[in-house]
Amino acid sequence: MKPSEIREMNLEEIEKKIIELRLELAKERGMLTMGTSLENPMVIRDLRRDIARLLTIKKEKLRSKR
């Protein structure tokens, strides 16, 4: 996800996306621990970075409301 796409979202949409990505990350990590080979091992890193991006922009929006 690009930061510009995230900035267009409202706080509720950002929260939903964070939850969705965290569930997907847990699923991918579970597959990895069970020994299943991942189709694309970069998925875990990308998910973590997307979550961090979402949290950062969420925090920016909350601070700007003050």
Swiss-Prot record:
Entry's Gene Ontology cellular component terms: ribonucleoprotein complex; ribosome
Keywords: Ribonucleoprotein, Ribosomal protein
CDD domains named in the record: Ribosomal_L29_HIP
InterPro entries linked to this entry: Ribosomal_uL29, Ribosomal_uL29_CS, Ribosomal_uL29_sf
One Gene Ontology term from the biological process aspect of the record: translation
Pfam families reported in the protein's UniProt record: Ribosomal_L29
Domain of life the protein comes from: Archaea
GO molecular function: structural constituent of ribosome
UniProt keyword Ribosomal protein present: yes
HAMAP family: Ribosomal_uL29 (MF_00374)
The family this protein is said to belong to: Belongs to the universal ribosomal protein uL29 family.
Protein name in UniProt: Large ribosomal subunit protein uL29
